[in-house]
């Protein structure tokens, strides 16, 4: 596999905000360039070590992406990819909110007495435990499976991997709906294990990674960032509309929560049909054969290094070495975040990157990590069901998409006219965006702590304020990759994705556990943790320093 293919494969779903904002920036600059005769001047003396964020300013717009794909056949492949991704994402988002009330009903059925009475606090505690167990198991498996899917798609093709992912989704949804139906008695671990199937082996992380690989096969290098940004906008659109559509289905069927899941299964089956009939494999047979040959040689090399004559011991040692090497290979990109001193011996770049990583962790703690516990809080405090949850998630998802595609590019364009944009270091534009985002995150959590137990309107205000922080993630990521050369961009993204995955593996289960333990005393107590981390994040932003030396050569 070439270095270029490897870099593309390392792109993960954690780049979603960064890539989507890229698409918005280019769309805005295309409009400006058409209406303003002065346009945006390009610096022809920029070197190959320019940051990725600067490449956004010079890259083609969305309106010219179609020209980057050679021939009508290539453009049709892209349209098929966008359609397939949207169908799979809407299938996932439709059942997202309907599943939670079904799990709660199943738990209530399992712990109720002979008269049908049950303790609602006990239900919240058990559902919290189910959610945290599911997230931990699925998160641990998906970290390893994401890389495996990328390797597998190189060997057998992108379309076949899409087929496998769709098939796994059908199996996962069918088994999960069976465990929640009246045909099966309540069993906690049956619900947990069936809920782990889809996110562990065919979740959004793997879907986006395979989509990135598909794009890399048919789109020129200089146009890939914008093309992937368009794919991300398709994902955000469907992930925002899906929960609302699911709410309409539940309302239309008078509260039948199984209908959205059946609809999801139908959409996934449609995706399977599209893969079988319309989708065209972009990867050439010789490339797949080369990847298979490389994989076989690597396995043979591991066997030859085992040095064991005993057959059984030989197999176990080989397998153990192979898994250890895979684990080390998975963690290898993290070393890129520990930058070397520059030519003058300064450690400012290293300290800044570490601080940005810490801010990214705190950002995740204040946004994504608290959502599972917050959703359970809403079902307990406001008695929300699938319909209301669908509206809430749709507001949050659509709001983030609007901010990334409209508000963020406009804000950045305005700030670039006020402050100097730096290619080799974070600048005042980045610091302003990070500080603003952390402030609105803190305000959103304060609203929930202060008014969350009084009115459900606080959830809507929370969603709108959280949406305003959407450009924090791309700002942090673009700031980090300013300190490295383009040839290491994929590895840096991979390292950041791995750090985020580890955070999501730990923090949400902790918040769910805390919520389950305190729901009978103070349901909103868990919110103080993300609220505290957000305050710490605001304070840390004042320690960010602009690196004034010439651009780095990269780590």
Curated annotation (Swiss-Prot):
Its main location: membrane. Keywords: Membrane, Transmembrane, Transmembrane helix. The chain crosses the membrane at residues 84-104, 126-146, 189-209, 230-250, 258-278, 357-377, 387-407, 429-449, 460-480, 492-512, 524-544. InterPro entries: MFS, MFS_trans_sf. It is found in: Membrane. It is a multi-pass membrane protein. One of its GO terms (biological process) is transmembrane transport. Residues 289-311 are annotated as: Disordered. One of its GO terms (cellular component) is membrane. It comes from the Eukaryota. Pfam families: MFS_1. One of its GO terms (molecular function) is transmembrane transporter activity. SUPFAM superfamilies: MFS general substrate transporter. Residues 105-125, 210-229, 279-356, 408-428, 481-491, 545-555 are cytoplasmic. Residues 1-83, 147-188, 251-257, 378-386, 450-459, 513-523 are extracellular. This is Uncharacterized membrane protein YJL163C. Gene3D superfamilies: MFS general substrate transporter like domains.
């Amino acid at each position: 596999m070439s270095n270029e293919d490897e870099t593309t494969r390392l792109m993960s779903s954690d780049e979603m905000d960064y890539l989507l904002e890229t698409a918005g920036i280019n769309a805005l600059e295309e409009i400006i360039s058409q209406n303003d005769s002065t346009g945006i001047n390009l610096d022809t003396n920029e070197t190959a070590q320019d940051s990725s964020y600067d490449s956004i300013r010079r890259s083609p717009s969305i309106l010219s992406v179609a020209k980057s794909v050679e021939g009508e056949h290539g453009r049709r492949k892209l349209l098929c990819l966008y359609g397939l991704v949207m169908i799979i994402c809407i299938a996932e988002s439709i059942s997202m909110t309907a599943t939670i009330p079904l799990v709660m009903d199943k738990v209530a059925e399992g712990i109720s007495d002979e008269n049908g009475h049950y303790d609602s606090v006990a239900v919240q505690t058990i559902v919290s435990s189910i959610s945290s167990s599911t997230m931990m198991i699925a998160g641990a498996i998906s970290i390893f499976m994401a890389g495996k899917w990328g390797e597998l798609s190189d060997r057998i093709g992108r379309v076949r991997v899409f087929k496998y992912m769709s098939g796994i989704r059908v199996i996962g949804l069918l088994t999960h709906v069976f465990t929640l139906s009246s045909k099966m008695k309540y069993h906690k671990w049956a619900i947990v294990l069936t809920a782990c199937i889809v996110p562990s082996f065919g979740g959004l992380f793997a879907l986006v990674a395979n989509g990135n690989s598909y794009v890399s096969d048919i789109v020129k290098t200089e146009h890939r960032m914008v093309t992937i940004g368009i794919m991300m906008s398709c994902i955000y659109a469907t992930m925002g509309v899906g929960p609302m559509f699911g709410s309409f289905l539940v309302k239309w069927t008078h509260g039948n929560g199984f209908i959205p899941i059946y609809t999801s299964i139908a959409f996934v089956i449609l995706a399977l049909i599209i893969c079988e009939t319309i989708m065209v494999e972009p990867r050439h047979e010789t490339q797949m054969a080369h990847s298979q040959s490389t994989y076989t040689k690597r396995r043979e090399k591991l066997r030859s290094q085992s040095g064991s004559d005993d057959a059984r011991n030989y197999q176990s040692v080989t397998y153990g070495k192979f898994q250890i090497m895979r684990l080390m290979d998975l963690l290898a990109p993290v070393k890129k975040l520990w930058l070397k001193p520059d030519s003058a011996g300064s450690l400012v770049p290293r300290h800044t990157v570490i601080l940005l990583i810490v801010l990214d962790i705190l950002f995740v703690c204040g946004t994504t990590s608290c959502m599972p516990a917050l959703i359970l809080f809403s079902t307990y405090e406001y008695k929300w069901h699938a319909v209301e949850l669908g509206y809430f998630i749709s507001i949050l998802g659509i709001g983030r998409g609007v901010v990334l595609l409209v508000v963020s590019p406009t804000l950045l364009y305005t700030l670039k006219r006020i402050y100097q944009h730096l290619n080799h270091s974070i600048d005042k534009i980045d610091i302003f965006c990070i500080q603003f985002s952390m402030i609105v995150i803190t305000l959103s959590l304060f609203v929930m702590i202060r008014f969350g137990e009084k009115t459900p309107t606080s959830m809507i205000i929370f969603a709108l304020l959280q949406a305003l922080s959407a450009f924090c993630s791309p700002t942090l990521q673009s700031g980090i990759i300013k300190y490295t050369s383009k040839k290491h961009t994929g590895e840096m993204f991979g390292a950041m994705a791995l750090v985020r995955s580890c955070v999501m593996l730990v923090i949400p289960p902790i918040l769910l556990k805390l919520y389950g333990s305190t729901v009978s005393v103070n349901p909103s107590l868990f919110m103080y943790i993300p609220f505290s981390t957000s305050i710490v994040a605001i304070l840390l932003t004042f320690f960010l320093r602009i690196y004034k030396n010439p651009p780095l050569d990269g780590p």
